[in-house]
Amino acid sequence: MRFPAPVEAVLRDAGWAAGRRVPEVAARVIRTVCAYTAGDGSRHTPFPAAERALTEFAGVYVDQDGPGVALRRAPFAIDPTMAVPTAATLAAFGRVLGVRLFPLGVEGTDDAILAIDERGRVFALDPAGEWHLGDDLDAALTTLITGTEPPRVADDGTWSPAP
């Protein structure tokens, strides 16, 4: 089973299904995001891990609010057009990690930026810090939907498993 049953149920309610592919939507949102140039000249550049994630999950909006395993479960959207002006922020965090990042969407009401790196790892960036949501999108979605506490990324770009 790809996702725990409760996670899969939430994703299905949000419009996802096993085998879902929306390449036209993914291409459109990638074009929109890549058209933006930050004041410092930073731009979003797609890569295969981002393209794969968006081909399957672009346009999935999870409407949830309530207690989770460790944290409150917040709504989130896999829609990078909601995080267009994040090129400079993601470029700076990417330099810390030593990889490129691409926006996936947002958590809450623009409370956090969701981003994927070239290796497929997913992160949340909010005013309190950066968080490793999972080594792949499936793990990150499970973290977000269950309200599991993710590990915080240290200033040197490393993290330890959450307590």
How does the language model describe each region?
Residues 94-97, 126, 130-133:
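Short capping loops/turns at secondary-structure boundaries
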Residues 122-124:
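Short, compact, well-ordered microdomains
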Residues 1-111, 158-163:
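A surface-exposed partner-binding patch
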Residues 116-119:
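Short acidic-glycine loop/turn motifs at beta-strand connectors
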Residues 112-114, 133:
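Short active-site-adjacent structural elements
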Residues 129-158:
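Compact, glycine/acidic-enriched structural inserts
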